[in-house]
Amino acid sequence: YMSASMESILTGYDDPRIAVYFAPCTDEQFKNTYRGIRQGTCFSHSHYAGLSKLTVTQTTDAPLMTSSEIWFLRAEAALRGWTDEDEESCYRNGVITSFHQNGIYQVEDYLNSERMAFDFEDTYDNGNNIEARCKVSPKWDSEADKEIKLERIITQKWIAMFPEGCEA
């Protein structure tokens, strides 16, 4: 199933990779939308069975490292002053490469978007609702402080590396 964090960020950003990573809900109430589940939630499987499931199967390729990941590593290295590369260019190349790796070729609107992650609202139990943790948009801000730039890089790296998010 899709996690609450993925729902918060991907739906908030209107990120088209959501349709590559997850199947839309089959539950009649939420049909053709994307809904996640907060990790660590005690729930009845019957309540959440119709929510967004992974599109990953036993036969899905599992690359060890992708070119988008390398671009994000280069962006982080540039941000930390370890290379002479431009962190914004590396960041943008990482997002573009991730989109292309997923068969999505319209990237510019996304890269210029100031959309933010949504607060997560649990489908069945509002006691599981959580405020969005991610506080950056996809749009690069060259005036932002180093920590905000790093959060932006790491957020996109995390999205791009799905389903290996723990690696990001």
Segments and roles (model prediction):
Residues 1-71, 78-168:
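Extended ligand-binding clefts on enzyme/binding-domain cores
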